[in-house]
A protein has these predicted regions:
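Acidic/histidine-rich helix-loop elements
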Residues: 57-74, 98-108, 256-274
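N-terminal carbohydrate-binding accessory modules
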Residues: 30-91
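An active-site-proximal structural segment forming one wall of the substrate-binding cleft
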Residues: 72-74, 78-88, 107-135, 142-175, ...
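Short, acidic/polar
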Residues: 67-83, 153, 274-281, 312
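Bacterial N-terminal signal peptides
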Residues: 17-27
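Active-site region of glycoside hydrolase catalytic domains
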Residues: 151-263, 277-300, 321-324
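C-terminal outer-membrane/trafficking sorting elements
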Residues: 377-466
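Substrate-binding cleft of secreted/luminal carbohydrate-active enzymes
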Residues: 275-355
Length: 466
């Protein structure tokens, strides 16, 4: 959420070599934490189940500086308190605007990057999952697809990905937050041009992250529709069909209670409305092969406390029952319609400003039952073997693959900006051995992302055309 009207103007920082940030990445990792664990090849359903219940470090790194909106410096003790209460995920919203230089490198300030990593380490030290995003970045204008914006998205995400490429899969990347700058009908899906621009930027970001290699080759990446609104989920254009992508929405439901402080909640009709909305959201996304991260939700200090407790319990329970992860928006504000705060961060040691609401979240999550249909979701190993000449691909290279059963086959090649430069489709092939040549025309030397699909199986590889 945008909870502050602080200036979003883009500051220009001294240029620091991108390579330096990449080299610093491995040194960020806290020794002995789950950040050092091996990648586990979890299905999306298992990953979301493990995330369980989440908490936002709101109005902190998403401000112009960590303390710029009146927050204290984040400490290990704060995150320890969150973990002790039963939360297993920390979402770390980050504003990068004002912390990187100009084109063409858009180099991120190394001190800011190091602080983002240090806070992530606090959660990883407690074996928590961490989501890192780009927040309050309204310069990603969606009125049309801009090559300049796309290049900026690629540069920023390449640097973030390089800084965290050695981290385990406990770290996930959320491409944006509530992307809507320049969009029409922001909470109803936007226009065709808006959706095309967002899909292009997210596709470019995914390709850039995957191209950095290391653990980023299979890291979970989270995308969202315009404004991250669940109302327009059916209009969401899913970027590259990558098996390690999920969808985030922000569900302040019902709006009158959750955002406006309308007072009471808890009738049978209230409960039925939440179930209906979650069922519609999850069912549609399931048809796209995605699972859901409820990246922001909550209720406020303006609401009556008994209703807040009921709502917190029920919503946390039902999100898990429907196969999602509920992540509470905590902005460290404790009064009025903007009072989503739960943890009093300035207290030493940190304490819960609304302990009964925090406990309701924990109890609600504990009572939830994650759908077994998502737990048994499998990402089968690719049986369609691809020969890529040890990772180097020449223009005349033959792609060899085996189909264990009849299916359609497609091969797409993306440049590092996320633009499709080649799209080959073979329909209804019988079981057997095949080969496909990458066409030389229109493809120059350089790095690309190759996406190979056979039936429901995907493989995505970084390749180099000589």
């Amino acid at each position: 959420m945008k909870k502050n009207t602080a200036s979003k103007s883009k500051g220009i920082r001294p240029v620091i070599m991108v390579l330096a940030i990449a080299l610093l990445g491995s040194s960020f990792i806290a020794q002995g934490s789950v950040a050092n664990d091996a990648m586990r090849n979890l299905s999306r359903g298992q990953y979301v189940k493990n995330m369980y219940l989440g908490w936002n470090l709101g109005n902190t790194m998403d401000a112009n500086t960590e303390t710029g909106w009146g927050q204290p410096v984040t400490t290990q003790a704060m995150i320890d308190a969150v973990h002790k209460q039963g939360f297993k995920t920390m979402r770390e919203p980050v504003t990068w605007n004002g912390h990187f230089g100009g084109s063409p490198t858009y180099t991120i300030d190394a001190t800011w990057m190091a602080r983002v990593a240090a806070i992530a380490n606090y959660a990883l030290n407690d074996s928590m999952y961490v989501m890192i995003n780009t927040h309050h970045d309204g310069w990603y204008n969606l009125s049309s697809t801009s090559p300049t914006v796309q290049a900026e998205v690629v540069a920023i995400w390449t640097q973030i990905a390089n800084a965290f490429k050695s981290y385990s899969d406990y770290v996930s990347f959320e491409i944006f937050n509530e992307p809507n700058a320049g969009a029409t009908n922001q909470y109803g899906g936007g226009s065709d041009a808006n959706r095309a621009a967002l899909a292009a930027y997210q596709t470019a970001a995914i390709a850039a992250i995957r191209a950095t290699g290391g653990n980023n080759a299979t890291r979970m990446i989270i995308v969202q529709g315009i404004s991250a609104s669940p109302i327009q989920a059916s209009t969401l254009t899913i970027p590259i069909p990558d098996v390690n992508t999920m969808v985030s929405t922000h569900t302040y439901d019902p709006v009158g209670f959750s955002l406006s402080g309308s007072g009471t909640w808890g009738s049978t009709a209230d409960s039925q409305s939440i179930v209906k909305n979650l069922t519609n959201l999850m069912s549609w996304l399931a048809t796209k092969g995605k699972v859901v991260v409820l990246g922001e939700w909550g209720n406020t200090a303006a609401d009556q406390l008994p209703s807040r407790i009921k709502h917190a319990y029920y919503y946390a329970q039902q999100v898990i029952n429907h196969g999602g992860v509920p992540i509470w928006w905590d902005n460290n504000s404790f009064s009025g319609a903007d009072g989503f705060g739960l943890l009093t961060r300035k207290a030493v040691p940190p304490t819960w400003g609304f302990p009964t609401v925090a406990q309701a979240l924990s109890d609600g999550a504990a009572s939830g039952v994650f759908p077994t249909s998502l737990l048994t979701e499998t990402q089968p190993p690719i049986e369609n073997k691809i020969s890529l000449n040890s990772g180097l691909l020449v223009k005349a290279e033959v792609i060899n693959y085996t189909l264990p059963k009849a299916s359609s086959v497609s091969l797409r090649l993306f440049d590092t900006q996320g633009k499709i430069v080649s799209n080959l489709v073979q329909s209804n092939q019988s079981a057997g051995n095949y080969e496909m040549k990458l066409p030389a025309k229109g493809i120059s030397s350089g790095n690309y992302i190759l996406e190979f699909k056979a039936g429901n199986n995907f493989i995505t590889k970084r390749i180099n055309v000589l």
